[in-house]
Amino acid sequence: MVLADFISIPTVSIACLAVLGIAYHRHQSNKNTRRPPGPKGYPFIGNLLELVSAERPHLLFPLWIKQYGDIVRFTVFGVENILISKFSTAIELLEKRGAIYSDRPHMVLENEILGWDAAMPTMRYGAQFRKHRKLSNALLNPNAARGYIAIHEEVSLRLLSALAAQPDQFYHHILIYATSTIFRISYDIDITDDKHDLVRLANGAVRKSAEAYQASGALVDVFPSLKWLYNSYPTTAPFSGYRKVIEDIKGEVVQANNIPYEMAKEKMRDGSATRSLVSDAITGLGGLDAISPADEHDIRGLAGILYAGQETTMVTITNTILAMIHHPEVQRKAQAEIDAVVPLDRLPTLDDRANIPYLEAFVKEAYRWACPLIIAIPHTVIQDDVYEGYFIPKGTSIIASIYDMLNQCPNAAAFNPDRFIDGTDLGDVPPDPRDVVFGFGRRRCPGLHVADNSVWAALAQLLASFEFLPELVDGKEVLPPLKWGKEMARHPQPYRCRIVPRENRKHCYAA
C-alpha cells in the first residue's frame, strides 16, 4: 500500500475545511487582476481535483501548455502556480529577476519532516542558502571539478569492462557507474556493486522521499499545520499506517546523510583519505578538530547535493543509448570522429574534449533529446511582480517545464547533433541545453560541472568502445520502443539491445 492510500481522503477533507476562509479572501482580493490563462478550476480548491485525478500531476502540464500557451496559471487552495515553457521566459524571470525569483516553496515534508533541511535544492532562499552556495561554489567550480577527472575515467573504465562481460545487464552497470562516481567524489568511498548497503540507502532515501512528496507533500506544504498528522497522529487511530511509512523514510534519510559522512571522517582520521568533497570542506574549515556541529550539518548537506545527480545521470545515459539504437548514422559519425582524433591505443579522456566538436554536439543533443526531467523544482517569487502584462503575486510558484523547453525546435523527435553545429533546427532551444537541464539563475545546480563531466566521460568511452544495436528476434533486428515511464525523471521503459565491442579499442579496457 502506498502513502497516498493512507492519507489522501482524510487530509484532503481536513484541508478543505481549513482553507475555505483563506481561499475565499485570496479569491476576492485577486479576482480583478489580469492573470495568465489556464484551467478554470473550482472555488476554493482551484485545480486540485484535476491534479489528484491525474495518474501523475506533471503529466497534465504538457496538455495544459498545448491548450493555453507558453504561460499557464493554475491554483490549489488559493496558492498560485505558473507553468512556463519558453527558455526566454525562464531567463527573464528566474535569472534576470533572480533577486525576487530565487526562493523555493515551503517544502514542509522534505525539509521539516523527512530531514532534507540541509539539502540546497529544496532550501529556502536566505542566509543559510547563501552560505551553502558559497561553500559549494568553492568546492564544485569548474577548476575544482577538473580535479575529479581521474575518478570519472577510472569508474567509466570499470563500466566498459562490466558491459563487455554482461551486456544484458546494462541498466545495472550504468546505475553502478552513476552511484560509484558520486560516492567516490563526495565521500572517497569506492562502490563496485549494487549489493552495497550505501547503494540501497542512496537509492531508497531519494526515491522514497520523492514518492512521499508526490503522494502528500504538496498538501502539507500548503497547510503546515498538518505536520501533526506525520509527527503526532496516534498510531492506533484509523489511517495511521502512513506514520510508519514516514518514520521508515526518515530513518533512511538520516542514514544516507550520516553513514557515508562518518566513513569519510574516519578515513581522514586514519590517514587513508584521498580527495573528496567532505575532506576538502572539512580541511577548508580548519580540520576535524575545528569544525562545529553547524559546520558538520552544512557539509552533510553539501555532500548530499550529488545524490540528485545519480538518477539524472543514469536517465541521460540510458536514454542516449536508446537514441543511438534508433539513429545508427549518428552513432557511426561520432565514432568516426573519435577514431580520427584519439589514438587507437587509448580511450578518449576529458582532456580530449575540446578537440572533438561533433562529440560535444552529440552530448548537447543527448541532454536535449534524453532530457532527464519533465519539470524543474519550482521557484517562488518573494514580492508582487508583472510580466508581459500578467500580475504575478508574491508567493507564486514558477514551474519550468524543462521537457517542453527542449522540444521547441523543428524535428524535435530526431536525434540530430548537427543542430548544435550549424545552428539550424534549433528553434527556441538554447545553443546549450545544459542551460536548461541544470536549472536557472541562483538555483542553478552547483554540481553541474561534476555531473556534466560524468555524462561526457561515459558517453565518449561508450561510443569509442561499443556499437549499440537493435535486439535480434528470429534473426531480424527489432527496434526498442520509444516509450517512457510516468515519473518526473524520464526513465525509458525497460528495453533490450545488443552491445557489441568494437575490435579496434577492445584492448583498452579488456582485463
Swiss-Prot record:
It catalyses: erinacol + reduced [NADPH--hemoprotein reductase] + O2 = cyathadiol + oxidized [NADPH--hemoprotein reductase] + H2O + H(+). Its cofactor is heme. Keywords: Heme, Iron, Membrane, Metal-binding, Monooxygenase, Oxidoreductase, Transmembrane, Transmembrane helix. It is an enzyme of class 1 (oxidoreductase). Pathway: Secondary metabolite biosynthesis. The keyword Membrane applies. PANTHER family: P450, PUTATIVE (EUROFUNG)-RELATED, P450, PUTATIVE (EUROFUNG)-RELATED-RELATED. Induction: Expression is induced under erinacine P-producing conditions. Heme binds at residue 445. One of its GO terms (cellular component) is membrane. The chain crosses the membrane at residues 2-22. Pfam families: p450 (PF00067). This is Cytochrome P450 monooxyhenase eriC. One of its GO terms (molecular function) is oxidoreductase activity, acting on paired donors, with incorporation or reduction of molecular oxygen. It comes from Hericium erinaceus. Cytochrome P450 monooxygenase; part of the gene cluster that mediates the biosynthesis of erinacines, cyathane-xylosides that show unique biological activities, including leishmanicidal activity, stimulating activity for nerve growth-factor synthesis, and agonistic activity toward the kappa opioid receptor. Its EC number is 1.-.-.-. The keyword Translocase does not apply. Belongs to the cytochrome P450 family. It is a single-pass membrane protein. It is found in: Membrane.
